[in-house]
Amino acid sequence: MVDIVDKALRMGEGRQIKKLENVAKATNALEDEIAALDDEELKGQTAKFKQRIENGESLDKLMPEAFATVREASKRTLGLRHFDVQLMGGAALHWGNIAEMKTGEGKTLVATLPAYLNALDGQGVHVVTVNDYLASYQAELMGRVYRFLGMSTGCIITNQKPPERRKQYNADITYGTNNEFGFDYLRDNMAWEKSDLVQRGHHYAIVDEVDSILIDEARTPLIISGPAEGDVTRWYRQFARLVLKLNRDEDYEVDEKKKVVGILDPGITKVEDYLGIDNLYEPNNTALIGYLNNAIKAKELFLRDRDYVVTGGEVLIVDEHTGRILPGRRYNEGLHQAIEAKEGVEVKAENQTFATITLQNYFRMYDKLAGMTGTAETEAAEFMGTYKLGVLPIPTNKPMIREDKDDLIFRTKKEKLAAIVRDVAKRHKKGQPVLLGTASVESSEVVSSLLDVAKIPHQVLNAKQHDKEAAVVAVAGRKGAVTVATNMAGRGTDIMLGGNVEFLADAKLKSEGYSPDDTPDEYEKRWPGTLAEIKDQVKDEHEEVVKLGGLYVLGTERHESRRIDNQLRGRSGRQGDPGESRFYLSLEDDLMRLFNTQLVARVMAKGMPEGEPIEAKSVSKGVRTAQKAVESRNFEIRKNVLKYDDVMNKQRTVIYAERQAVLKGADIHEDILKFIDDTVLSYIKGANNGSDKPADWDWDGLFKAISSVYPIAVEQEGAKDAVDKLKGDKAVEALKELIVSDAKDQYSDFEDKLGSEGLRQLERRVVLAVLDRKWREHLYEMDYLKDGIGLRGMGQRDPLVEYQREGYQMYNSMIEAIKEETIQLLFHVDIERVAMTEDEETESDEDEAVNAAEAVMGLDGEAAATGESAPAEPETDDEAEKTTIDELADEQKNEKGIVGMQPISHAEGKVPANKRPKSEELHSPWADGRTFPGTGKNAQCPCGSGRKYKMCHGQNEQ
């Protein structure tokens, strides 16, 4: 099936390549003409192109001239001329494809072509890389080309402050990592001031190492979180000690393949005895099960120096695909705290999600998306299905002559490692550079220690030495170099035989005190001479290493993904250089042990001689089968993550659009008046007990509830008399008009005291405060819903459909709550205080007045915006058509599968199991004086009455 899909996707590939070749030919035809321009004339091309775009000329028509201009600027600044295949790659990127270009083909230089072309219309271009170092290095190096042509370059890196970020985003071309771009988007949607925004829209993105970012990292959503309420760190420490007393397969079981654990009956007994409780599964003890499962996972499934490292008293996650540390990332749902307790470091507070988005949905926001990688072909179907990106293989500039040897497979890891050391010693003795690829920090340190014993000098590059990554890789191709590195995916510095000329030239100039940022004129002046000097030094060594066979890549084990194996191999044989690659495997490697156990057992039973490699096609086939099994599993995980996030994505898009409109000064006065109408109507319908007759309505409950929203002046008896002779909808409408008229009269008095502009500003700040808080609560509820939704499958119901349905119900309930609490807050704000604030033209007192009103109502008035935002003001029309909150709510009522849905209990989505009512309580009469702690007041009451909690048992809360 996969082969059929792959063939279908490749239909028409020849025609596409022909189009790319035509672009290269058209660009070449202009080369002499552009080369004849002096520096000032060449720089003047940019202004001419912009004018032609203003006059209506398309970017496609400009492309050959723009590419020829960039090529000439690159020759004059960097001494690098784009090859024809690089021009083809640039055209593929401009047309919104993935350009599959082998390692060493100059992808960084290729990006300058479409980046310059697409920046001409002034909307900004984002070039996405895998780490801060590469973002800085590429922005600095390629920025010389852009600056020569009058284009500005920015770079987004960790720890920049909002004003600096805004400046970088305002540049024509901005480099940065996928995480920084994504988190800035989330922070922009938590900002409280228009001046705090940093991004300016999502026009065009070029993603380097696109498979690493859009495939490998797509399983993990971006999350901004803050401390949750309550201190539960002692439980993590207690369970970390407890699980040390439990034995695997006796007290609990572990499935390493699926990464799940389960407690067995003997283990349950031990846990209950240790904690001094009678029944671990009683409702009051339910939360303890989560601590127990996380403690077992931390003990058995998450290993130090493989999944994480401990540095400076912190547990830092290691990216399984690239071997890099992921600063700031934490496992969720209490797992990170369990690992911290296991390692004996400070257990940090649990977090609550404030904002989240998957990488898939973030990058799908761009008007145009493109990417580059050396290994996209195996994931072509996923790129097309998820991102609508085609994959175009770009020919190499010179033929590939690397020799890829068959795998050598040993029975045990010990035998494999001994053979690896012998092979490396032989290669090192003759001076051939060797790159050893490992799958984890732990493996790299084991290999390093064995090389130390063999007295083979070497460099180690793993998550613990990530700061010297580029320097190590730049010299990994020198004669006699031996480099041990964790996964090479995303290592953006080329391994050049004899040494990386550009890197060494840049390092020499910087050591002499020259930099393209601080001393650009002197740097550019000295660059050609320094580059020529380094080239001469490297040339002889390059030729010597070529004679020795080029770079030898030795993989110490197969990775779960064939792509990452191919990326490791691809470090050798760049630009027509010779090279060699081979993988050493053992039947004890995780990939074989977990995913091909029967084959392993069969081969081991044959009793092969110790130290002899196994040569069997069945074993090599078994490796490929195991890799395909893991790739298939990971693809399903990514698909699942996306399906569930798509439910949230539409909601998030509308909420964020509404929030941005408010933040930028939209007049929402008419919305506020409608909120009053909707809130009053909701209360009346909630109090009618299903009866058409006003005499049967709960008048006491209704007036008590409405008086909590605003100081109602309508007399209860007078209201009853006014609708006594009416029935059904007429009675509801008459009562609504009576109460709404009273509320709007009082609200009009506020406007008289504050003035129109003063009230408009207050309305915006109150809506932001309420919207942020209710959105956080909604994310919290949706997390709880998703955690337990898988169990619906046991009842023959599709968990995803259930999640969609209940998620939309919860969303609509949140919208009601936003309307109601906005009105409630506005009527509780100290108007005199706000009026004084307006006179002084300050906002801090106004915010305090809003917070004080929240405190009166028992709400948390703190803004969610933790962390500093940054992008520039989006260049969008404030009057542009947008979907409103109400429109989405109405639309969702008509969604397929949503019609006729019964209301759900928010308690199931939000309240932890140990706080939920017992089943025998669910049918109790509503006026029995009980309360259900933790239930949202706009949620349906857990008693089963069908009423909102605040109109039911919530009335009994003090």
From Swiss-Prot:
Q: What is its main location?
A: membrane
* Membrane topology per record: Peripheral membrane protein
Q: Which reaction does it catalyse?
A: ATP + H2O + cellular proteinSide 1 = ADP + phosphate + cellular proteinSide 2
Q: Which GO terms describe its biological process?
A: intracellular protein transmembrane transport; protein import; protein targeting; protein transport by the Sec complex
Annotated Gene Ontology cellular component terms? cell envelope Sec protein transport complex; cytosol; plasma membrane
Q: What does this protein do?
A: Part of the Sec protein translocase complex. Interacts with the SecYEG preprotein conducting channel. Has a central role in coupling the hydrolysis of ATP to the transfer of proteins into and across the cell membrane, serving as an ATP-driven molecular motor driving the stepwise translocation of polypeptide chains across the membrane.
The entry sums up its family as follows: Belongs to the SecA family.
Quaternary structure annotation from Swiss-Prot or TrEMBL: Monomer and homodimer. Part of the essential Sec protein translocation apparatus which comprises SecA, SecYEG and auxiliary proteins SecDF. Other proteins may also be involved.
Report what the protein is called. Answer: Protein translocase subunit SecA
Q: Which organism is it from?
A: Bifidobacterium adolescentis (strain ATCC 15703 / DSM 20083 / NCTC 11814 / E194a)
Gene of origin? secA
